[in-house]
Amino acid sequence: MKLLLDVSPLVALLWKTHLHHERAVAWRKHKTIVLCPITELGFIRVCTGPAYNLAMNDARKLLSDFIHDEKPEFIPADTRALDGMPAPSSSKSTDWYLANLAGAHGMKLATFDGGLSHPAAEQIP
């Protein structure tokens, strides 16, 4: 099954110092991973924020190199925010959108978020 990556697993895969880097790398083996504009933008937002403090061009290059080397598939963010199951709270709206998007494309959202109780979400062990 193809798996749309949530932002946190994407960050963990690319940052060796991330708390869950080894967990993400071990999980990643033999998986078909997928990105979308939301996860790519989320990655750039996290990497240019205070936790990693990368310059915008450096964050874009890190993501670009990953895409070039790993060749994840890509899907457009082609569902409306109002399509699919409604989020239980505003703080979960992006997570639920990504899970709805994954489900609409016949895949699951791969996440570290154990609190995401959406039928199209799969927690990374």
Where do the PLM segments sit?
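Short, well-structured N-terminal submotif of metal-dependent ribonuclease cores
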Residues: 1-35, 50-61
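A conserved hydrophobic position in a structured secondary element of the catalytic/binding core
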Residues: 5, 35-38, 77, 111-112
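Catalytic metal-binding/acid-base residues of hydrolase active sites
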Residues: 10, 115-116
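Short, conserved alpha-helical segments within structured domains
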Residues: 39-40, 94
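Active-site neighborhoods of divalent-metal-dependent phosphate/nucleic-acid chemistry enzymes
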Residues: 69-115
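Active-site regions of enzymes building and remodeling cell-envelope glycoconjugates
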Residues: 119-125
